Curated annotation (Swiss-Prot):
HAMAP family: UPF0260
InterPro entries documented for this protein: Puta_zinc/iron-chelating_dom, UCP006173
PANTHER family: UPF0260 PROTEIN YCGN
Family according to the record: Belongs to the UPF0260 family.
NCBIfam families according to UniProt: PRK05170.1-5, PRK05170.2-5
Protein name: UPF0260 protein OCAR_6616/OCA5_c14500
A Pfam family matched in the record: CxxCxxCC
């Protein structure tokens, strides 16, 4: 659910601790997205094992500078295979990164210190090394499908060390 970074939610309470994903308002749902951009990376699936591999190639709508979708409201029409996260599918998508707030909330866990709802700063996701900023090498329009295997990377499935810290360094 990557979108261009916005001001953090003006929620005074920690709604993600008291509500289920199904109970969230649209604004609360959208504010859970930390703007990391990991879900906008192209992924490959091993047909034999079902294992998902991330690449450092982004969707054609991904704005590398803003680290978000360049046409978020129309993304599904322009990119038919864009996965819209829902309360149902975040519990079953096996490729969501370990830092994904939707996944964390679905598992009853709290958000990390760098999440904009916690820090009050949309840049902490970048400071913590969680976002794809500076790591995307191309968009899908620039790489042939046959060459995507050459762009497989492991980092999107990992949580950076500084992101695991309890607070900002």
């Amino acid at each position: 659910m990557t979108r261009p970074p916005e001001k953090p939610s003006d929620q005074k309470d920690s709604f993600w601790k008291t509500k289920t994903l199904e109970e969230l308002s649209s604004a609360e749902w959208e504010s859970l997205c930390d703007g990391c951009g990991r879900c906008c990376l192209e992924k490959l699936e091993d047909e034999d094992t079902g294992k998902i591999y991330f690449t450092h190639v982004a969707c054609r709508l991904f704005d590398v500078g803003a680290c978000g979708c360049s046409d978020y409201p129309n993304r599904s029409a322009k990119v038919p295979d864009c996965v819209r996260l829902t309360p149902e599918n975040v519990r079953t998508l096996n490729w969501l990164p370990p830092s994904c707030a939707y996944k964390l909330v679905a598992e009853g866990r709290d958000l990390y210190w760098w999440h904009p709802l916690i820090s009050g700063d949309p840049n902490t996701v970048h400071e913590a090394g969680v976002s794809v900023r500076g790591r995307v090498v191309a968009t899908e329009d620039e790489v042939d499908d046959a060459d995507l295997e050459d762009h497989i990377v492991r980092w999107p499935t990992l949580l950076p060390k500084r992101a695991r810290m309890k607070r900002r360094a």
